[in-house]
Swiss-Prot record:
GO terms for molecular function: S-adenosylmethionine:tRNA ribosyltransferase-isomerase activity. It is found in: Cytoplasm. Transfers and isomerizes the ribose moiety from AdoMet to the 7-aminomethyl group of 7-deazaguanine (preQ1-tRNA) to give epoxyqueuosine (oQ-tRNA). This is S-adenosylmethionine:tRNA ribosyltransferase-isomerase. PANTHER family: S-ADENOSYLMETHIONINE:TRNA RIBOSYLTRANSFERASE-ISOMERASE (PTHR30307:SF0). Transmembrane segments: none annotated.
Amino acid sequence: MRVADFSFELPEALIAHYPQPQRSGCRLLSLDGPTGTLTHGIFTDLLDKLAPGDLLVFNNTRVIPARLFGRKASGGKLEVLVERVLDDHRVLAHVKASKAPKPGAELLLGDDESIRATMLARHDTLFELCFDDERDVFTILNAVGHMPLPPYIDRPDEDADRELYQTVYSQRPGAVAAPTAGLHFDEPMLAALQEKGIEMAFVTLHVGAGTFQPVRVDTIEDHIMHSEYAEVPQEVVDAVLACKARGKRVVAVGTTSVRSLESAAKAAENGLIAPFFGDTRIFIYPGYHYQVVDALVTNFHLPESTLIMLVSAFAGYKNTMNAYQQAVAEQYRFFSYGDAMFISRNPRAPQEKVSP
């Protein structure tokens, strides 16, 4: 399967650099997987599309201010993007510098260079850093870190992004990118969903910077997926099984919830789904048979990304590419701060051939 088959033309002007003033005020493109029918509306229409007893599964990860600017003690400027917090003082991070720091190198971080860190070791593309500070990593990052806005949001982060680039239900710090489908849910909408009898459950997947890495191979099957830490606790498993038993739909909010739930399904030796705590490299592309997820709330994704492949596996390739073509024609806003889709699963998608 060719990566190029998942390309589409996107005018620069459709990339959203700021969210809508009201979270739930974005547009919603609904795609009926079985028929391919598209419906245009606004995000609060989701209330009418869900039935009492349906289960919404959210990702409650919290974005950390993971970007730090500074320099090596020896002089050269650098930029650090924390990928994973290992303990109170150590992190794995991407380091951008004219010359990569060597083990033992001292780094001066923060806009005022007040934070000292030491480079301990290199692990492939990541650097293990230790902060020489009595405060823990999260406290340091909250004090001097910048919100790690995606590369396509071409502006410096602002104070407002600390709230805007965060879901209202985020709880577990550790992500370096927001689970963006969740950004559209505000408190009034969550209350309205509960009032209607929509069930809710929360997984955790700490989104890594790898989510923005381009696919650098020509053939999808050759791509090596990045690893992310996910947790699907017993109460989520129970909620999913209860939802299926009452004949209702499991609706994943975002591709990270999809990847968490489907990882937990793969891990189940007996039955549909089992608790899952660990790293996942699940790569979902056309041909994949979904085990758990019946419907999906998601944003619009980058051309040739693993996420548009995941959506194509869910809705069908032709349905997905047609929906994206229509979204461009109708001037929907794309990517993290953009508009949303609501998609029901196409049961014929796994058998569909991918051909532009």
